[in-house]
Amino acid sequence: VGRAGKGLAYMFTMMKTARLNVGIEGHAVAERAYQNALAYAKERVQGRDEADGSDDVAIIRHPDVRRMLLIQKATLAAQRALYLRAAALTDFAAACPDNVLRKEAERELDFLIPIVKAWPTDNGVVLTNLAVQIYGGAGYVEESGVAQYLRDVRITPIYEGTNGIQAADL
């Protein structure tokens, strides 16, 4: 299974990968909720256009809906960049023959992993909740599917080390 006395080091290597994966999971659920909310906002007709006063406009034309969608889109793009950096560092550290460069990548990765786990999972809950809000009352019922995304993403800040407690790793 490994060398004697190295179990804790092996476990933390596994935890890095697990935390990276959970961060990606939090992001992925929020991304799916965003995609659904965007499609819904384009087809759901309600109210009038504030700019020209026309009736029966898609809710994506309403400023508050646009604000929520833009928050989701921008946050998801930033999260994606962060976890892709962590994934690239993981691969680099595993394959780099230069000991100095490998250790440098491992140090950066050690710093990033708690962030990669906590930020996309905490915000995954927030962003998915925005998707429910965009759906309005329909978002609360099972038929929309978005209520399930909220339940699915809610566990991600908790498992593989609760975000508040693992923040001590920073």
Predicted segments with their positions:
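Internal glycine-rich alpha/beta core junctions
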Residues: 1-170
